[in-house]
């Protein structure tokens, strides 16, 4: 049996709409992500387990893991009889790359089970395609970091889908999921069809400056440039208490904060453990909406998807 874990990810990172994403892992050692196991069988079967399994589609063919199996078999030109199990530990519509976790874990597990017939580039292209079935458009800012680890910049030129950019070891990512759902499709629909020239220029300056600051090892500058003029001004209205939370975490000492992916998860960057804990405590008390919400203090997950056991 092959068992693969795929970590949560925070896409956009305020400054890089659809072109930046970071894989994250809790500092306490908890696994924040999905697990898919594959073993040989007489015919295909899929079993759903985990905290959020009851949120999955009741029809198996609508489950993205089934679609991953189907697409993988098509790529190999044969039907591969396997028993698959999805441990759905990630909330759906959370802004933490939930669908990407399932897609990445499923495809890596199938590839491992079959002796790695597909290379990473081919796998990543397939992951983006399947993620697009859920979100409505092909984009790699969750699947790339989830699969490859670290902070990934989407390239999509010269046969390169994404490449890793250097992160900062001292950065702690406080992630607060309030327990409500925001669909990626809904969050995209709220965005304008056109942007003002000054916003386009500001976006380019922020993103170019952020990448420069990462490579020139200027963490304070990198954090200061994590500003969103593309999505956050429009999506903030979908997130109860978001504006107040951003102001509060800044006053506590967070270096930057914003919407993780399309929300509703809020991320806050800190460079001191005690600051991160105070931010986490405030968000636990004031940003969570129900019992399904949670807060994790994380670091970059540099490993990406990996075989367990």
From Swiss-Prot:
Binding-site list for ATP: 91-101
Enzyme nomenclature, EC number: 2.7.1.39
Catalysed reaction equations from the record: L-homoserine + ATP = O-phospho-L-homoserine + ADP + H(+)
Keyword flag Nucleotide-binding: yes
Subcellular location: Cytoplasm
SUPFAM superfamilies in the record: GHMP Kinase, C-terminal domain, Ribosomal protein S5 domain 2-like
Nucleotide-binding listed as a keyword: yes
InterPro entries on file: GHMP_kinase_C_dom, GHMP_kinase_C_sf, GHMP_kinase_N_dom, GHMP_knse_ATP-bd_CS, Homoserine_kinase, Ribosomal_Su5_D2-typ_SF, Ribsml_uS5_D2-typ_fold_subgr
Role played: Catalyzes the ATP-dependent phosphorylation of L-homoserine to L-homoserine phosphate.
Alphabetized PANTHER family for the sequence: HOMOSERINE KINASE (PTHR20861:SF1), HOMOSERINE/4-DIPHOSPHOCYTIDYL-2-C-METHYL-D-ERYTHRITOL KINASE (PTHR20861)
NCBIfam families recorded: PRK01212.1-4, thrB
Name of the featured protein: Homoserine kinase
Taxonomic classification: Bacteria, Pseudomonadati, Pseudomonadota, Gammaproteobacteria, Enterobacterales
């Amino acid at each position: 049996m092959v068992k693969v874990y795929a970590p949560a990810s925070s896409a956009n990172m305020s400054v890089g709409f659809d072109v930046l994403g970071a894989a994250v892992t809790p500092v306490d050692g908890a696994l924040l992500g999905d697990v898919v196991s594959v073993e040989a069988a007489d015919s295909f079967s899929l079993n759903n387990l985990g905290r959020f399994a009851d949120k999955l589609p009741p029809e198996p063919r609508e489950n993205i893991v089934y679609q991953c199996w189907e697409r993988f078999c098509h790529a190999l030109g044969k039907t591969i009889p396997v028993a698959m199990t999805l441990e759905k530990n990630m909330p759906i519509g959370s802004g933490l790359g939930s669908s990407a976790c399932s897609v990445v874990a499923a495809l890596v597990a199938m590839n491992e089970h079959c002796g790695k017939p597909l290379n990473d580039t081919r796998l990543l292209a397939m992951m983006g395609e399947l993620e697009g079935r859920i979100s409505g458009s092909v984009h790699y800012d969750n699947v790339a970091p989830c699969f490859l680890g670290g902070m990934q910049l989407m390239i999509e030129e010269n046969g390169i889908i994404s490449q890793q950019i250097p992160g900062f070891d001292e950065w702690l990512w406080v992630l607060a999921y309030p327990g409500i759902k925001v669909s990626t499709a809904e969050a995209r629909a709220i965005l304008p069809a056109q942007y003002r020239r000054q916003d386009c220029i500001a976006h380019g300056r922020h993103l170019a400056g952020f990448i420069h600051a990462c490579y020139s090892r200027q963490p304070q500058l990198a954090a200061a440039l994590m500003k969103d003029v593309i999505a956050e001004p429009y999506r903030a209205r979908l997130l109860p208490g978001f504006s107040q939370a951003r102001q509060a975490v800044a006053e506590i000492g967070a270096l930057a904060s914003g919407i993780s992916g399309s929300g509703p998860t809020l991320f806050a960057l800190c460079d001191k453990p005690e600051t991160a804990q105070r931010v986490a405590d405030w968000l636990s008390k004031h940003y969570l909406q129900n019992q399904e919400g949670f807060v994790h203090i994380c670091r970059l997950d540099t490993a990406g998807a990996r075989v367990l056991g």
